[in-house]
């Protein structure tokens, strides 16, 4: 597949062909139709002082995207091939004090698709169902 790949810990990115994604049983594979550039993508592209703390190269970035489901993992529920989806890229733990008190947006264990793992600046993206 083609993807915008951050190959090295330096400014810039490259549009390249990468290996096809394989999903885990609890994930869905999304054929990305649209992705947007967010302010948090800029530090990754420019490789400022924040980027090395969170983003590991090589990887695809981008956390705001939508598309259609092209594959459903064996244990994923409530999704089917062809569903149009918009991705909630912030994955919270559900267990910490903040999550237990309705403040998931400040979860201490928050992981972000496209920051802490591969994202949506490619033809396909694998995301938790």
Regions found by a protein language model. Name each.
Residues 1-4:
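Short structural boundary motif marking the start of a folded domain
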Residues 8-10, 70-75, 129:
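Short loop segments at secondary-structure junctions
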Residues 10-15, 39-40:
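Short N-terminal binding/cap micro-motifs at the start of the first secondary-structure element
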Residues 21-35, 49-97:
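Glycine-rich beta-strand-centered segment in the early N-terminal region that forms part
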Residues 40, 86-90, 115:
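Glycine-rich phosphate/pyrophosphate-binding beta-alpha loops
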Residues 40-46:
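Cytochrome P450 core scaffold surrounding the K-helix E-X-X-R motif
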